[in-house]
């Protein structure tokens, strides 16, 4: 995240870490904010004519939701009037270049949703809240596709289990 702080990409990346999809981020405006509450009710999508338009719902009607975002992020959206105004594909291109420059394993912008689900789970947030914030309607999808383990958290869990298994 430090690499995008202060850039035009910061808001979009941070919202990605809140579990938002790229199209949802690109459709967000300050009108979607009520203090720290961000309503996710639309998405920027490409049409069959290869034009980008705002669709009046996110990926699914079950994806409509309101999430709480931090003060600084809310203030940025309020000040700028939007979350990301440029072409949605630029988020993917920027991330690809950033990952390559940093020499870290490649990942997609959409993978930030998995980061959100995994981090929230590792913090002990119940699945019902993770699902509500990420716009998932099925624990099956959440568990099968999005939740992953973090090596440090897994190591902590293994040490805890090991301590209980000692004679």
Regions found by a protein language model. Name each.
Residues 44, 134-159:
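Catalytic-site neighborhood detector that most strongly recognizes the C-terminal catalytic loop/helix
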Residues 2, 27-76:
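Conserved tyrosine-mediated DNA breakage-rejoining catalytic core shared by Y-recombinases
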Residues 32-39, 126-145:
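Short, polar N-cap/turn motifs at the start of nucleic acid-interacting alpha helices
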Residues 43, 65-105, 116:
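Active-site/catalytic core of tyrosine-dependent DNA strand-transfer enzymes
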Residues 9, 63, 103, 111:
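Exposed loop/turn and edge beta-strand positions of beta-sandwich/beta-sheet ligand-binding modules
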Residues 1-26, 113:
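Basic, Lys/Arg- and aromatic-enriched nucleic-acid-binding interface segment
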Residues 24-26, 107-108, 117, 124-136:
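Active-site-proximal segment of tyrosine recombinases
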Residues 158-166:
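Short, basic, alpha-helical segments at the C-terminal edge of helix-turn-helix-like DNA-binding modules
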């Amino acid at each position: 995240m430090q690499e995008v702080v202060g850039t035009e990409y910061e808001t979009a990346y941070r919202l990605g870490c809140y579990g938002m999809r790229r199209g949802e981020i690109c459709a967000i405006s300050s009108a979607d904010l009520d203090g720290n509450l961000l309503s996710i009710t639309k998405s920027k999508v490409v049409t069959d004519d290869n034009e980008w338009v705002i669709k009046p719902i996110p990926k699914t009607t079950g994806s409509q939701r309101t999430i709480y975002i931090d003060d600084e992020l809310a203030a940025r959206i309020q000040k700028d009037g939007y979350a990301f105004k440029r072409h949605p594909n630029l988020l993917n291109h920027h991330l690809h270049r950033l990952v390559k420059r940093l020499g870290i394993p490649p990942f997609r912008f959409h993978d930030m949703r998995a980061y959100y689900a995994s981090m929230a789970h590792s913090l002990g947030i119940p699945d019902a809240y993770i699902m509500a914030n990420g716009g998932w309607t099925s624990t099956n999808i959440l568990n099968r596709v999005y939740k992953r383990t973090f090596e440090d958290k897994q190591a902590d869990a293994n040490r805890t289990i090991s301590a209980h298994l000692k004679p």
